[in-house]
Amino acid sequence: MQVTETKSEGLKREFQVVLAAAELEDRLTTELAGMKDKVQLKGFRPGKVPVAHLRRVYGRSIMADVVQNAVNEANQKILEENKLKLALEPQIKMPEDKAEIEKALDAKADLAFQVALEVMPTFELQDHSDITVTKPVATVSDEEVETALKRMAEQSRSYADRPEGSAAETGDRVVIDFVGRIGGETFEGGSAEDADLDLGSNTFIPGFEDQLLGAKAGEARTVTVTFPEGYPAEHLAGKEAVFDVTVKAVKAPGEAQIDDELAKTFGLENLDALKDAVRKSLANELDAQSRRRVKKALLDALDARYAFDLPPTLVHQEFAAVWAQVEADLKSRGKTFEDEGTTEEKAQGEYRRIAERRVRLGLVLAQVGETADIKVPDEEVNQALIARLRQFPGQEREVYDFYRKNPQAMAELRAPLFEEKVVDHVLGQVKLVEEPVSKEALFADDEDEAAEAAAPASEAGASKGVISEGVISEGSAPSHETGAA
């Protein structure tokens, strides 16, 4: 087997592989000889079938296997001798001349084919000890605990029927039957019976609740509303609907009590236990946000520190995933790029830079994880799988079977776990400085990003430092199966 490099441009490599006719003949003969004692043919005793006869019967099919094995060996030889890591599966180009292939399959001519590769970049991991990352830290105030308790009490309070003839007010709960029509025709999801609606909660279509203010039990009303342009059900978006509504009951909210009884509705012994649980829950929220801010700052620092060529196809695939999300978001909101103050061309440029950032950070974190021999225990992957199953009540068995039979799906569960471990590892190398901040300051960046996210050209999606699942994977170079994050 003769291997010659014919192209080396950036991360693209091409090689010509030549299998001599004599080598093809030797490989075929070896394979046929190995079959001799295993094949049973009519008219021959076991193990006595002549190799020449086997060649006449099986030669072509065995030669196809010989060629495939040779291609695999050539790929492995190229990677090992040149110390390359693949970004994508090799592209094999066989001769276009069928007569040439026929001769090679008969071992009467050499077989020459091309191998095109897109490889991973090589770069040296740097010393990260000079990186300083600020960790914003906020604490839970007594006022925040009280506010949360009031909200829980309001959500848990009971409702009692108002006196007969009472008109519904903001804050009341009405029990209604309704049938909605668009153009005189009913539509799926537009009807319900005994539905509870808290007036002022803004849980129904804008304008629906307002038209029930003043209604009395037993009263029938016609409510006319228009579905928002960005309504999730696209077939309803922007359309006017008329609802025939029957008010069956008007109920007033009871007093919101913050006491031991409230705690018991949440399965806790007393109010003190509820306060502790609320404080812990709020603290967990602050800790999670602090983690997001720290991770973002770290990834920003790594992104600024590393510069190397990126596999074009990986970037293209990552961009395609991100861009699909952008287009879906615009469509769901009924917006265009012009509505957001940009153009499609400009937005594509910005999101291509986001894709490049994600791929670059994925490669850096993957190499850090490989160098540090970071592993994700199977137990943690199983816990992630259980959490995923809980998202599909009633379908747990089907979802479980899907993951167990789909290695790529399991890899997508493992990837974020691996990423967090790698981030923790790098955080252990940098200088982490805690900075006390208010809750408002801690979440300020999220508010800024939410505002930016409305504009397709913003980097809000990438500024959170999210590496798409599949770009970074445990114990290996990044996969070419990128997903959106």
From Swiss-Prot:
The keyword Glycoprotein does not apply. The keyword Membrane does not apply. Residues 452-462 have a biased composition (Low complexity). GO terms for biological process: 'de novo' cotranslational protein folding; cell division; chaperone-mediated protein folding; protein transport; protein unfolding. It is found in: Cytoplasm. It catalyses: [protein]-peptidylproline (omega=180) = [protein]-peptidylproline (omega=0). Residues 171-256 form the PPIase FKBP-type domain. Residues 443-485 are annotated as: Disordered. GO terms for cellular component: cytoplasm. It is an enzyme of class 5 (isomerase). Pfam families: FKBP_C, Trigger_C, Trigger_N. Involved in protein export. Acts as a chaperone by maintaining the newly synthesized protein in an open conformation. Functions as a peptidyl-prolyl cis-trans isomerase. NCBIfam families: tig. Consists of 3 domains; the N-terminus binds the ribosome, the middle domain has PPIase activity, while the C-terminus has intrinsic chaperone activity on its own. Belongs to the FKBP-type PPIase family. Tig subfamily. This is Trigger factor. The gene is tig.
